[in-house]
Amino acid sequence: MIEPLLCGIVLGLVPITLLGLFVSAWNQYRRSSSMPDWE
């Protein structure tokens, strides 16, 4: 049996973690392209 609190924490952290990884990857991609317009 899984505790509701633990389940809620996991369901809350997983999307945030995936979003953080996506944002960090997008920042590295945008930085490597070095577009002056985004500065």
From Swiss-Prot:
The keyword Mitochondrion does not apply. GO terms for biological process: cytochrome complex assembly; photosynthesis. The chain crosses the membrane at residues 5-25. It is a single-pass membrane protein. GO terms for molecular function: electron transporter, transferring electrons within cytochrome b6/f complex of photosystem II activity. It holds the Pfam family PetG. Keywords: Electron transport, Membrane, Photosynthesis, Thylakoid, Transmembrane, Transmembrane helix, Transport. It comes from the Bacteria. The keyword Cell inner membrane does not apply. GO terms for cellular component: cytochrome b6f complex; plasma membrane-derived thylakoid membrane. InterPro entries: Cyt_6/f_cplx_su5, Cyt_6/f_cplx_su5_sf. It is found in: Cellular thylakoid membrane. Its main location: membrane. HAMAP family: Cytb6_f_PetG. NCBIfam families: PRK00665.1. Belongs to the PetG family. Component of the cytochrome b6-f complex, which mediates electron transfer between photosystem II (PSII) and photosystem I (PSI), cyclic electron flow around PSI, and state transitions. PetG is required for either the stability or assembly of the cytochrome b6-f complex. The 4 large subunits of the cytochrome b6-f complex are cytochrome b6, subunit IV (17 kDa polypeptide, PetD), cytochrome f and the Rieske protein, while the 4 small subunits are PetG, PetL, PetM and PetN. The complex functions as a dimer. This is Cytochrome b6-f complex subunit 5. The lineage of its organism: Bacteria, Bacillati, Cyanobacteriota, Cyanophyceae, Synechococcales.
